[in-house]
């Protein structure tokens, strides 16, 4: 989800270690997801008969008003996609011909919830969510937006040991160090440098944590920024400059793995220049905001977006979904209905279709966020009780 105001004022930057970034939500994403369905094109599915799927209008604008979408018709479960590969991180960024299928979550969460903290134990078998996915996203903020303590982060991470990779968005709140100290020995981390005007500071923070509590082998990827183009915070060429700066600083610090800038799938489709900069395409995509997709079709929908991004990059870059999930609470949007049961079904569909290439969004409910349009922004926590 987009963290807006990425290039913050000095006063906000100085407060970064004390509070969560403001307006971390899907605000700009809602207005564009349905513009993906505008006309028909043809793709080849595993060498079989061609299948018509909806594609983007060539002149679509990222922040245009919502367009009425038509239902997609592709049988996407067999779409051939490639997973990201890295010689530095073979175990986590693996090359694959298509997303792997796996078992998915089958039970519902039933415990009562409390908004005193953004994390809560559901009593669910966490392994049912973690099986077959690349990882899960995590943010270290209290309900008030204040930073969680090291012990609180450790308590959260104790519930996430079955997830292969933990994705972080920034370096504030001492989160890199706290997660390194708390994660399981076999877990990896996908790190982020959120403030693009503080890249060197972010690299220094990461380097310190890595050298003190782990090694660069624990890091699968570093992202420079999150949804910069989708949020109108940078042009594609500026994103390229940020990635180059980050890659150089990280290399000097001893890291030689993948460097990316995460954006939305629609931003990449509308701005294929972005394909030139990241080592692989790291994109966020949420079927709920399509409004024409039910939770049970989330996996099929997500595969279609992977195919679109891969095609936009002329098949030259592998695609990893760095956020996808379903809200458990909020307003019905078209045929998309938030509920805990639908969240479970969406996670199951995503895991079965393309889990090996997907980070689930997110570990716990984010009560520190504003409700946002449709009232869903707080309620994406897969392990939370509501």
Curated annotation (Swiss-Prot):
The entry's propeptide annotation covers 20-30
Keyword Mitochondrion listed? The answer is no
Gene3D superfamilies the record matches: Glycosidases
This protein's UniProt keywords: Cell wall, Cell wall biogenesis/degradation, Cleavage on pair of basic residues, Glycoprotein, Glycosidase, Hydrolase, Secreted, Signal
Give the location in the cell.
Secreted, Cell wall
InterPro entries listed in its UniProt record: Beta-glucan_modifiers, Glyco_hydro_17, Glycoside_hydrolase_SF
Catalytic site: 323
Statement: the UniProt record of this protein carries the keyword Metal-binding = no
Its Enzyme Commission number(s) read: 3.2.1.-
Posttranslational mods: N-glycosylated.
**Chief subcellular site?**
secreted
The record's Gene Ontology cellular component field reads: cell surface; extracellular region; fungal-type cell wall; fungal-type vacuole; vacuole
* Molecular function in Gene Ontology: glucan endo-1,3-beta-D-glucosidase activity; glucosidase activity; mRNA binding
- Which EC class is the enzyme in? hydrolase
* Single biological process term from Gene Ontology: cell wall organization
Residues spanning the signal sequence = 1-19
Which positions are glycosylated?
89
The note filed under miscellaneous reads:
Present with 38000 wall-bound molecules/cell in log phase YPD medium.
User: What's the stated role of this polypeptide?
Assistant: Glucanases possibly play a role in cell expansion during growth, in cell-cell fusion during mating, and in spore release during sporulation.
Similarity comment: family membership: Belongs to the glycosyl hydrolase 17 family.
Protein's UniProt name: Probable family 17 glucosidase SCW4
> Taxonomy-wise, where does this protein's organism fall, top ranks first?
Eukaryota, Fungi, Dikarya, Ascomycota, Saccharomycotina
């Amino acid at each position: 989800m987009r963290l807006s105001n990425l290039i913050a004022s000095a006063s906000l930057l100085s407060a970064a270690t004390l509070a969560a970034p403001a307006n971390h939500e899907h605000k700009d994403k809602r207005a564009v997801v349905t513009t993906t369905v505008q006309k028909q094109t043809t793709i080849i599915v595993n060498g079989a008969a061609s299948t018509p799927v909806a594609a983007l209008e060539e002149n679509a604008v990222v922040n245009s008003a919502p367009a009425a979408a038509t239902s997609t018709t592709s049988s996407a479960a067999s779409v051939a996609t490639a997973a990201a590969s890295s010689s530095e991180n073979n175990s986590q960024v693996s090359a694959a011909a298509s997303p792997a299928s796996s078992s998915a979550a089958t039970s519902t969460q039933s415990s009562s919830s409390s908004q005193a903290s953004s994390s809560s134990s559901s009593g669910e078998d966490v392994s049912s969510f973690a099986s077959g996915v690349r990882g899960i996203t995590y943010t270290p903020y209290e309900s008030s937006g204040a930073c969680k303590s090291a012990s609180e982060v450790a308590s959260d991470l104790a519930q996430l040991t079955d997830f292969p990779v933990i994705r972080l968005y920034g370096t504030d709140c001492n989160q890199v160090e706290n997660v390194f100290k708390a994660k399981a020995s076999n877990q990896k981390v996908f790190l982020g440098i959120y403030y693009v005007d503080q890249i060197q500071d972010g690299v220094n923070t990461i380097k310190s944590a890595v050298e003190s509590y782990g090694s660069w082998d624990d890091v699968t990827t570093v992202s420079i920024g999150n949804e910069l183009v989708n949020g109108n915070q940078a042009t594609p060429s500026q994103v390229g400059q940020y990635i180059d700066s980050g890659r150089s600083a990280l290399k000097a610090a001893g890291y030689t793995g993948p460097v990316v800038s995460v954006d939305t799938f629609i931003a990449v489709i509308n701005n294929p220049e972005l394909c030139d900069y990241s080592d692989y395409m790291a994109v966020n995509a949420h079927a709920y905001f399509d409004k024409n997709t039910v939770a049970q079709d989330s996996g099929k929908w997500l595969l279609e977006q992977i195919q679109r991004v891969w095609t936009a990059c002329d098949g030259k870059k592998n695609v990893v979904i760095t956020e996808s999930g379903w809200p458990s609470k909020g307003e019905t949007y078209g045929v998309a209905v938030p509920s805990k049961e639908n969240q479970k079904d969406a996670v199951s569909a995503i895991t079965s279709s393309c889990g090996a290439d997907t980070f689930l969004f997110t570990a716990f409910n984010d009560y520190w966020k504003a409700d946002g349009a449709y009232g869903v922004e707080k309620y994406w926590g897969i392990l939370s009780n509501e």
